[in-house]
UniProtKB/Swiss-Prot annotation:
Contains 7 disulfide bonds. It is found in: Secreted. It is an enzyme of class 3 (hydrolase). Snake venom phospholipase A2 (PLA2) that shows a moderate inhibition of ADP-induced human platelet aggregation when tested on platelet rich plasma. Exhibits high hydrolytic activities and prefers the anionic micelles (dPPC with deoxycholate) to the zwitterionic micelles (dPPC with Triton X-100). PLA2 catalyzes the calcium-dependent hydrolysis of the 2-acyl groups in 3-sn-phosphoglycerides. This is Acidic phospholipase A2 Ts-A5. It comes from Trimeresurus stejnegeri. Belongs to the phospholipase A2 family. Group II subfamily. GO terms for cellular component: extracellular region. GO terms for biological process: lipid catabolic process. Expressed by the venom gland.
């Protein structure tokens, strides 16, 4: 579901040090 996908993006973005979500 969309919320799970958004959480995954947030985790990946945080780990890479780049915030993609909402850019």
């Amino acid at each position: 579901n969309l919320m799970q996908f958004e959480t995954l993006i947030m985790k990946v973005a945080g780990r890479s040090g780049v915030w993609y979500y909402g850019s």
